[in-house]
Structures are given as C-alpha cells and as structure tokens.
C-alpha cells in the first residue's frame, strides 16, 4: 500500500490501545543485550525501527526469543558482544544508528552502521564528535557526518560534555559509551530531553547520578536483567488525541499510555489550546509513569509554543501542526530547529502539505506560524517518507471538506503498523 485516501467520517468514540513506546523498546533491547541474565519485555513495539535494533544485536551474537507476546533477551554481559560479520542495517531508525554508535564505540571489534536513503542523509556528527573526544575511532561520509559509519571500538576515556542541543539520542549515545569508559562520563543539555535512558539505566543497576539538565554515568559497572513492561507510545497516541479533539462529538479513551513528564509536552500544548484531555488511573510501571488518556472534542485556539516545551513535544509537532490548522487564530512555533533534521525536514514538509490543504503557513528557520481555518480543504499530501508526517496528514483528512490522499505511506510501519486499520475503525464508526 503506497497511498491512501482519507475522507471525513463519524465522530470518534470508544477505547483503544496504541503500540508500545518506541524509545523504551529500543533501550530494552540494548540494555538487555549487555546485561547479565535474561531480560523479558512485554508490550515491545514490533515496528521496523525496533526490529532493526533487534536484528543488529542478533548479528552480534545475542539470542532473542520472540513468541509475539513476550520478548526474552539472553544478555551477554558488558563485554560479551561479538563482531558482526556484515554491515548492521539500521533501516530508517536514527535512534538505532546513534545509540548503537555509542555502544559500539566501546567494543573491541570493528563494525559498520548503515541505513536507508533517508537515514543516510541525517546528521551523525552530533554523536561522532563527542564519542571521538572519548577516544572512539569513527569514520563516515562528509567527515563523519553521514552514514555509513565505520567504528573501530576500544578503550574509552570519560568526558564531561555540554551538548549544544537537547537530544535524547546524543545523551543516550554518550551514556552507553560511558558504560565502557574509565571514570565518570557526564552530559549536560540546554534543557532536559526525554529521560528514558536515565530511568532504564537505573533499573538495570547502572551507577548514575542526575543533575540539572544532565546525567553522570560511572564506567565498568555490570548490568542485571530485568522484567520490562513497555507502555503505549504517547507519540502514537498523539494522532488519536488530535483526531478526537478536532472531530466534533468525539470522546476517546486511550489506555495504558506512557506519560513520562519529559514526553508530555503534547498534552500541555493541546490543553493550552483549549483541549479537553484528562489523565486517568495514573501509575508507575517499570520505572515509567503510565496513565489512561481521556480526550473529548474541543474548540481549539492558537497559542505560542517555544522554549523548554519544545523538546518535550519534539516528535509530536506534525500532529500539533494539524491541531493548529484547525484552531481559531494563529499558532506560533519557535525554538524548534531540531525538526529540520528529523526523518525529513518536518517544518518544511508540514508547511508544504498544510498549504495544499488551504492553510496559511509562514515558515522561519526555527519554526512556523500556522493560521487556522474553519475547515481544511482536500488534496494530495506527501509524507516525504516520514511516518509522523503520513499519520498527521491522515488525521487531517478526518475533518477536511474533501478527501486527502496521502502518498508514500509504507513508512508508517516504522512505528505504528496498525495505524490505518485503527483509523478506519473509528472513521467509519465500526465497533
């Protein structure tokens, strides 16, 4: 299926469960593989990105059993990985490539990381540079900025690193390398990015300390296997949250969603726009906050989004842009230049597509201004191979005057394989 046409449907009512959190699923494989013992994972996201991570560790000698419900990772210990006999293919996954670069920097073997045509265009110098400071030997195209990356691992030195951007991928790559460094490795960010790595490192028994916008990891500490329960991904829930808000007479309950405070910027933004969003039955599972999310259709208004809210909602901006297009007034997004180096340039991609649907969008280097319309128009939208762009534009089709055809939608399997079947179920009002 390479394109889909979405037409307006009925109100969205009922309950649903979204796939497991992609970030937590990646990290459960990585830490489980280098821990001692067998780590079990329930709720693992079997999207293409996470399967790329799984394949990489299998290629390094890690036994991973998967019965479709429970994942069992037979850890090899901190120094038990084997040299892969071929290039490790990360597919479209920037998380796989950047975090693996950090982990592989500390291994006593040679490895090569590559990916698809989109991933090979994404900047890698942001992790290569600090890892090189630690003593890693990493070569790549464009002076180490573009994959494929060739990594000759070995002994690493601890560093203190001031990251120029708030990025969980940069932070996590350095933290993973820090497990193999001699001494204490620290990373500080301009503002705190998602902290799944810090939580999971602590759960597995790593020695770490957190401080204001930063973390310190002690090298040489062995990890121990855990039982992991992965909650639903709030980035996937975001599409249905926005869909319920903008579709009249809707009420959706999304069960078992991770509501880590470093990830709930989407909820804060949509509430500030007037959205009715309630967290129900808040609890903690595997060191992560979890809740059910109750959403009711709401009249939205434009707001300004900037500062520390941005990294807490960085992956949800395509969905936020659709909400802004349906809101009264203008929504201004600033401090969001990171969106330009995601799977695609998400600022440009959303601007182009929203204009196609009749929305006025003014683009700037670090963000955009979106002036909402009473009703979106129809048209042909392009995903640019970006799963979040494809899903956001499909949500727009729920409330458009005419059909929205979204091209190049196979990318959705990266993070939400059953997205379109769920969307169709609610769009048609099927039970």
From Swiss-Prot:
Binding site for phosphoenolpyruvate: 22, 94, 122, 169, 346, 388
Entry keywords, A to Z: Amino-acid biosynthesis, Aromatic amino acid biosynthesis, Cytoplasm, Transferase
InterPro entries for this protein: Enolpyruvate_Tfrase_dom, Enolpyruvate_Tfrase_sf, EPSP_synthase, EPSP_synthase_CS, RNA3'P_cycl/enolpyr_Trfase_a/b
One record GO biological process: chorismate biosynthetic process
EC number, UniProt record: 2.5.1.19
GO CC annotation: cytoplasm
Main location: cytoplasm
Alphabetical list of Pfam families matching this protein: EPSP_synthase
Location relative to the cell: Cytoplasm
Molecular function GO terms recorded: 3-phosphoshikimate 1-carboxyvinyltransferase activity
Pathway assignment: Metabolic intermediate biosynthesis; chorismate biosynthesis; chorismate from D-erythrose 4-phosphate and phosphoenolpyruvate: step 6/7
Residue sites binding 3-phosphoshikimate per the record: 22-23, 27, 167, 169, 315, 342
Catalytic activity: 3-phosphoshikimate + phosphoenolpyruvate = 5-O-(1-carboxyvinyl)-3-phosphoshikimate + phosphate
List of catalytic residues: 315 (proton acceptor)
Subunit structure: Monomer.
Sequence similarity: Belongs to the EPSP synthase family.
Entry function: Catalyzes the transfer of the enolpyruvyl moiety of phosphoenolpyruvate (PEP) to the 5-hydroxyl of shikimate-3-phosphate (S3P) to produce enolpyruvyl shikimate-3-phosphate and inorganic phosphate.
Protein name: 3-phosphoshikimate 1-carboxyvinyltransferase
Organism whose genome encodes this protein: Pelobacter propionicus (strain DSM 2379 / NBRC 103807 / OttBd1)
Record gene name: aroA
